[in-house]
């Protein structure tokens, strides 16, 4: 696990929940994260990550939340605020525009070796999905993570990945929170304690040029 983070054959991007419903101005959840998205210029930075990954031939693994469809949460006994909000808003509705990946961030499976993993139900893109299996099949050891939301799905996935033995880098301006304060608390206070590296997108892309 000592190879540099930018070692392309052993490194992958994990991009979490880049759905229209989250990061497009017309998305169902956009209003909840718009302040933080604007403050961090998140969408531009996510596109910068994808562009840099393509140029460096680093595969992107897409960790996506389960799409909503009628009956998804029927008889669930352990709903939390997140699942309740998704149920009531019908965010990421199956087959809808909102459940599509934002234009410019779409996977390139054949050209870049990107992988769309099975969808997560709660916060971690590892729990109840095939992400770990897919990474092991390709002998990936280093993960660079970005996406939504800073202190929920992104952070939870990073924590889980670290527990599984991956070298994890988090990109501070490739994400957003339900408020700028919540996002900043995650990136400034929590992340440095739980992962291997915390960087801006610009700092990370600079390492690819060295």
List each model region and its residues:
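Active-site-adjacent betaalpha module
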Residues: 1-12, 21, 48-56, 73-74, ...
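A short alpha/beta connector and helix-capping loop motif
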Residues: 9-11, 26-53, 57-62
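Short connector loops/turns at beta-strand edges and beta->alpha or beta->beta junctions
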Residues: 18-23, 28
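Catalytic-core segment of enzymes that process non-peptidic bonds
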Residues: 62-71, 77
């Amino acid at each position: 696990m000592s190879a540099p983070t930018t070692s392309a054959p052993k490194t992958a991007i994990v991009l979490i929940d880049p759905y229209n419903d989250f990061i497009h101005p017309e998305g169902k959840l956009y209003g909840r994260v718009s302040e933080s998205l604007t403050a961090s210029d998140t969408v531009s930075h996510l596109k910068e990550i994808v562009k840099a990954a393509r140029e460096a031939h680093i595969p992107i693994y897409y960790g996506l939340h389960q799409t909503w469809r009628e009956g998804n949460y029927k008889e669930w006994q352990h709903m939390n605020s997140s699942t309740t909000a998704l149920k009531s808003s019908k965010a990421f509705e199956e087959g809808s525009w909102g459940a599509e990946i934002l234009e410019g961030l779409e996977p390139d499976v054949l050209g870049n070796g990107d992988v769309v993993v099975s969808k997560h139900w709660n916060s971690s893109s590892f729990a109840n999905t095939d992400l770990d299996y897919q990474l092991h099949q390709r002998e990936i050891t280093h993960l660079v993570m970005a996406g939504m939301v800073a202190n929920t799905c992104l952070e939870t996935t990073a924590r889980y990945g670290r527990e599984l033995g991956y070298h994890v880098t988090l990109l501070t301006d490739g994400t957003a929170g339900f408020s700028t304060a919540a996002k900043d608390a995650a990136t400034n206070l929590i992340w440095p304690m739980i992962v291997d590296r915390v960087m801006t997108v610009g700092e990370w892309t600079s390492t690819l040029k060295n």
